[in-house]
Amino acid sequence: NKLEIVIITVIDTWGSSPRPIGSSMIVNSRNDIVGSVSGGCIENFVFAKSLDIIKSGKYNVLEFGVTNSQAWEVGLTCGGKIKVLLEKFSYTDLKTIKKINKVFNDEGKLIILTDLSNGKREIIESKPINNNFFSKMFANETSKINIFNNTNWFCKVFSSQYKLIIIGAVHISESLVKLANILNFKVFLIDPRNNFNKSNFK
């Protein structure tokens, strides 16, 4: 639909923070919101900034902490600090978005590197890869800021959806499936008994 989106990602934290590094929130040009970066503390503020970025096309890095007057205004009172990256993606970035979607729904991993000085992006795919540094990142699935050639890059690891295999279509499984779906697991329910309440597991 040629919607433009802004992905807001936690790229660094200090002390107590509501969401870990790599947590993301997405805002599109229809004002839809998915995800969170602080559990409600700064979402309204970064939402407004995202709408500005959709218009301007510029990336932005914002920092919030209790010593920042702006942080009190938006409600970040947990005692720590967070830094977030706001990046615009449009239909011209469809190839990148399709790669992320394929990794999430299938298998494999990839890393998107963002140059924090200018917003430039590069993609590192997991196979084949001969770089020991990125191999460790893929193995640990740890997103973080790294320095390459005296430049700060945020390295975001994308991996497939976590899977939960449940053996037995019993009443406890029904509640477990609902909980797993809320937590965004890909659920596989296995039971060879065909008459065990298929209608309850849609």
Regions found by a protein language model. Name each.
Residues N1-F201:
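Segments forming oxygen-rich coordination pockets for charged ligands
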